């Protein structure tokens, strides 16, 4: 069950672990864990104010054996606000 598993999100371009379980491991306050209360299987990564520099591959990992993982490509369209 997902209740006894750790879900982590990693940014692939620099291998930076952004979140693990409910903890955020980046000083960039735009990142947060999205985990609706009562839904143990839903773990998302929220990024507010995405910028072109944020584009790239992000990977969700679950500490199962073997490890479960799913990659997501973030594409940012539009102009960057200054």
Model-derived regions: residue spans:
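N-terminal V-set
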Residues: 2-32, 73-75
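Extracellular/luminal immunoglobulin-like beta-sandwich modules
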Residues: 8, 15, 53, 57-80
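Extracellular beta-strand/loop-rich beta-sandwich domains predominantly from IgSF
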Residues: 16, 22-57, 64-66
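Active-site/binding-pocket entry motifs
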Residues: 31, 80-81
